[in-house]
Every structure is written in C-alpha cells, then in structure tokens.
C-alpha cells in the first residue's frame, strides 16, 4: 500500500476531483448493476437460493455468526426453521410476552439492503477477528427517527444458530443512548453535522486513479460538504458480538453487503459533545 502526504490545499483539490470522478463511476456502476439485475433469469435466482439451501443442509452456515446471518436474512424458510416459537419478547413498556408468528418478529430488511453497520468501542475491536466460538450474538435494529430499537438475540444451540428472544426499548435504556441521540441528528441535519466535525478531520481514501494507493491527510471541516460520503441514516443496525463501549469513542463500520467494501467513521466525545474525528474508505 502506497501512502501519499499532501499539503492542505492539494489534498482539498484532489478530494473534490476524486469525489466527482467517484460519482461518475458510481452512476456508471449503478447503470451496469441495474442492467445485470434486470437480465437475471428466474433460473439464476433459483440457483443462488439452491446454493444457500445446500450450505444450510451441509451445516456450512453455522461456522461463524457472519456466515449464518447473511443466509438467514435471505431465506424465509430458514428464518422459520431457526426461530424458536413462541419467542419471548420484552416490550418497550417492560412487559413480558411471547411472539408466535413470523409477522410479529418483523422483517430483516435492515440487514438485507446495500449495507449494514456495526458499532465498536475502538479500532482495535474492529480489527480483531470475530470469535468462531461465540455462542450468543445480539443484533439491534435501530430506528433513528423514532429513537427506538429492537434487539434480536441469537444463540448457538447444539451447534446451530437460533433466534431465541426479542427486546424492544427506547434509546434511553441502552448503553449507547447518548451516542444514538447525537447520531440521529448528525445523520439528518446537515447544519448540525457540519458543526459536529473535528476542526481538522483526518481522512484516508482510496485514489480513484490507482486502486493500490491511499490518499491520507486532513481536511478543514468546511470541506466536508464537498467530500461528504453518504452517512448511514434512517434505520441502521448494530451487531453486538462482545464489544466494550465507553462514552469517549465510537467507531462505526459501514459494510457493503456481500461486496467487501467498507467505510469507517470514528467519533470522539471531547467533554462537550460528540464529533466526527476521522473517516476512511
């Protein structure tokens, strides 16, 4: 990997140029993707589903939670097989009840789109390998607009992952409540977002003219609107393996579903409020 150090103005010009080219490439890619999608035959779709079914039958989806959840969100019959009805549910009012059908469980569209998000307490946690021996993982569906969330708890039982319970609650009951309230406004209010950037924002982006090269440096907060990537908004996810959160730092990883692409947003709390400190793609 080649690293380039640019003076402030040079970096600014290059970033704007890079983004402009990136938008053009993205549009072309989207057009190509649309064409490919439109030309897929029902046979090819069935073939993909058949491959997933074979993976389930051969127990290849239970090696790690990441493997399992990717398949689980795409195969309704697997969801039916691996959901332990009646499913215990704690409501937002604190009442204990049960869910007896898939409709009440809700869909997993928040994990089946173009991307999903995971929050970590540090870069070290993000870079660490997920433990294949994990036996319990929680998946949060976070609604930033209503400031509510539903937690899906998955447990590995007899070697296979199962959805075992649900928990609905408002932000105030979660350890990340302060950050979620901040991020709900950060992702929906451009003025607030601009005010919540570190004075010197560290960026690390891939050079569109050389995929093996990385452009690294700092930009002024005022340049963020020209460079600004699409920040996750609306309904986001958080897969909780065994992260340890503090009130000083949150690392948000935006992962392309099945593409291997990722963006990383690092937020810090300086005692007065949360600020975006760095961004990398």
Model regions and ranges:
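Bacterial signal peptide processing site
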Residues: 19-23
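Surface-exposed beta-loop interaction hotspot
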Residues: 157-194, 200-211
């Amino acid at each position: 990997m080649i690293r380039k150090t640019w003076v402030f103005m040079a970096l600014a010009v290059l970033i704007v140029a890079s983004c402009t080219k990136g938008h053009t490439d993205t549009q072309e890619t989207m057009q190509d993707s649309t064409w490919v999608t439109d030309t897929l035959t029902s046979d090819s779709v069935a073939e993909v589903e058949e491959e997933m079914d074979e993976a389930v039958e051969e127990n290849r989806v239970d090696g790690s939670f990441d493997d399992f959840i990717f398949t689980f969100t795409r195969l309704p019959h697997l969801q039916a097989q691996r959901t332990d009805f009646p499913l215990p549910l704690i409501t937002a009012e604190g009442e204990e009840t049960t869910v007896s059908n898939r409709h009440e469980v809700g869909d997993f569209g928040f994990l089946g789109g173009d991307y999903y998000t995971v929050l970590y307490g540090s870069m070290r946690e993000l870079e660490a390998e997920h433990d294949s021996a994990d036996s319990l993982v929680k998946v949060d569906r976070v609604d930033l607009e209503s400031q509510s969330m539903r937690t899906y708890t998955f447990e590995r039982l007899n070697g296979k992952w199962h959805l075992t319970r649900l928990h609905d609650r408002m932000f105030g009951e979660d350890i990340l409540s302060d950050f979620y309230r901040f991020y709900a406004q950060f992702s929906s209010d451009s003025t607030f977002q601009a005010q919540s950037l570190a004075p010197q924002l560290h960026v690390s982006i891939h050079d569109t003219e050389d995929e093996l090269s990385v452009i690294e440096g700092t930009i002024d907060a005022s340049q963020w609107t020209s460079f600004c990537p699409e920040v996750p908004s609306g309904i986001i996810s958080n897969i909780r393996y065994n992260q340890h959160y503090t009130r000083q730092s949150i690392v948000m990883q935006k992962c392309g579903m099945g593409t291997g692409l990722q963006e990383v947003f690092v937020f810090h709390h300086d005692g007065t409020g949360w600020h975006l400190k760095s961004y990398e793609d």
